[in-house]
């Protein structure tokens, strides 16, 4: 069985996700789709000869030749060009989507042969699919943490609707009473400085360390940090939460479904309210959690300097139970089931 994929090859969530499946041997053939924001593609991630799609449409003689030997096309979140999966069906190629519920269209223009849902929340949105968790990447190494001393937030490129809660975390710094050591990592510093200006922190507030630039996951979740803070507003799948936990960090995120089903509950941040929204017009309606900066600050103060070894050990168990060795065969069986 030959499994094709069209994907980003960038040091961001979808790029890392596709590379993980390729490195595990689930995906056999790749077309790289150039990121619309101009983020460089890491063509070296894939074999020599892998082509890069530089237009919005996925069509043409090279694409047709690519499909000649493909049995199943696997997509992550989006096919980029909705005409392409329809063309796959015309060519007799099966289509499988690993969806991110918040980015799925209310009126999709293609009927996928199978949904492989990465979270229990995605399973609720796509009940005809099957739920298989995303495995932890092998390069995520576990390190024992014993005390909550150094806190980390990964803002990335901020994301749609500030869904990572970066602005709320920054606003919380005005209310933190303890001596907090917080680092915020981001792709580009402009976005963080804009949020810092918007937050209007008073004199004397905690000043975070800002580190900008592309970073590999193994560097992000290294032993330098003890606690990962991410007051996320929505998400079914969150690779940073998963990888931080698997690396041995204590994870402080919003107490919401489905992350509260697999993360330790004690450090989770209470939700002030919930509302129904859309990430963009035409997409599925979703529930968004609202978190109060004062509550975030109280949680940071509560855990700063506290013992966290039991959470670190739980992360080690999670890493073992959610390895590629545990789940690769389930993905292969799911893909074979559509043939």
Can you annotate each of these PLM segments?
Residues 193-216:
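Nucleotide-activated donor-binding/catalytic signature segment of Leloir-type glycosyltransferases, i.e.
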Residues 250-253, 260, 270:
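Short hydrophobic beta-strand element within catalytic cores of glycosyltransferases
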Residues 35-37, 121-122, 131-141, 189-190, ...:
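Short beta-strand->alpha-helix junction loop in the catalytic core
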Residues 287-296, 304-336:
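A charged, aromatic-enriched C-terminal amphipathic alpha-helix characteristic of glycosyltransferases
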Residues 233:
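Aromatic "clamp/platform" in nucleotide-sugar-dependent glycosyltransferases that forms part
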Residues 140-164, 170-177, 183:
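Conserved donor-binding/catalytic core segment of Leloir-type glycosyltransferases
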Residues 4-5, 31-125:
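Extended catalytic core of nucleotide-activated donor transferases of GT-like folds
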Residues 107-108, 126-150:
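Acidic anion/phosphate-binding donor-loop and adjacent secondary structure
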């Amino acid at each position: 069985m030959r499994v094709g994929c069209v994907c980003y090859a960038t040091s961001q969530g979808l790029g890392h996700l596709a590379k993980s499946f390729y490195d595990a041997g689930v995906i056999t053939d790749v077309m790289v789709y150039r990121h619309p924001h101009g983020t460089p593609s890491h063509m070296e991630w894939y074999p020599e000869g892998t082509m890069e799609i530089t237009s919005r449409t996925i069509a043409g003689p090279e694409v047709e030749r690519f499909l000649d030997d493909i049995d199943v096309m696997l997509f992550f979140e989006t096919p980029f060009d909705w005409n392409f999966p329809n063309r796959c069906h015309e060519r007799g190629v099966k289509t499988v989507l690993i969806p991110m519920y918040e980015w799925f269209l209310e009126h999709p223009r293609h009927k996928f042969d199978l949904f492989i849902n990465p979270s229990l929340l995605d399973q609720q949105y796509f009940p005809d699919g099957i739920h298989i968790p995303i495995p932890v990447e092998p390069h995520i190494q576990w390190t024992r943490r014993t005390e909550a001393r150094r806190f980390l937030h990964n803002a990335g490129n901020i994301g749609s609707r500030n869904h990572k809660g970066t602005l709320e975390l920054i606003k919380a710094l005005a209310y933190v009473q303890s001596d907090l050591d917080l680092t915020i990592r981001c792709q580009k510093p402009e976005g963080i400085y804009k949020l810092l200006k918007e937050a209007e922190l008073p004199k004397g507030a905690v000043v975070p360390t800002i580190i900008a630039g592309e970073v590999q996951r193994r560097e992000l979740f290294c032993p330098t940090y003890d606690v990962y803070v991410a007051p996320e507003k929505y998400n079914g799948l969150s690779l940073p939460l998963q990888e931080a936990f698997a690396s041995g960090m204590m994870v402080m995120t919003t107490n919401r479904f489905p992350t509260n089903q697999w993360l330790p509950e004690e450090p989770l941040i209470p939700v002030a309210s919930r509302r129904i929204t859309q990430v963009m017009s035409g997409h599925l309606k979703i529930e968004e959690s609202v978190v109060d900066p004062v509550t975030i600050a109280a949680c940071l103060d509560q855990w700063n300097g506290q013992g966290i070894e039991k959470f670190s050990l739980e992360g080690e168990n999670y890493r073992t139970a959610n390895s590629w060795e545990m789940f690769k065969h389930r993905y292969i069986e799911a893909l074979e089931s559509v043939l």
